[in-house]
Curated annotation (Swiss-Prot):
A Pfam family reported for this protein in Swiss-Prot or TrEMBL: Exonuc_VII_S
Matching InterPro entries: Exonuc_VII_S, Exonuc_VII_ssu_sf
Location of the protein in the cell: Cytoplasm
PANTHER family linked to this entry: EXODEOXYRIBONUCLEASE 7 SMALL SUBUNIT
NCBIfam families: PRK00977.1-3 (NF002139), PRK00977.1-4 (NF002140), xseB (TIGR01280)
Native source species: Symbiobacterium thermophilum (strain DSM 24528 / JCM 14929 / IAM 14863 / T)
Similarity comment text for this entry: Belongs to the XseB family.
Protein name: Exodeoxyribonuclease 7 small subunit
Claim: Cell wall biogenesis/degradation is one of the keywords in the record: no
Lineage of the organism: Bacteria, Bacillati, Bacillota, Clostridia, Eubacteriales
Length: 74
């Protein structure tokens, strides 16, 4: 299911998972399930960002031969 989420949906769900984990009122098994889901969501978001970065670099390369530099947020 994670693979079907947009970046925004995955981040929103990840924030919910973090809030639930931070509440501290969870049985161990539920906490482990949420942790596992959070890791999967974080990996999904990273993969989506990596793809977006590659697309940006390709566009820069194609539109005028501009030197491609890795995207580095401020």
């Amino acid at each position: 299911m994670t693979q079907e989420l947009s970046f925004e949906e995955a981040i929103q769900r990840l924030e919910q998972v973090v809030r639930e984990l931070e509440s501290g009122d969870l049985p161990l098994e539920r906490g482990l399930e949420l942790f596992q889901e959070g890791v999967a969501l974080a990996r999904h978001c990273t993969a989506l960002l990596d793809r977006a970065e590659a697309r940006i670099e390709q566009l820069l390369e194609r539109d005028g031969g501009v030197e491609t530099l890795p995207f580095e947020p401020e």
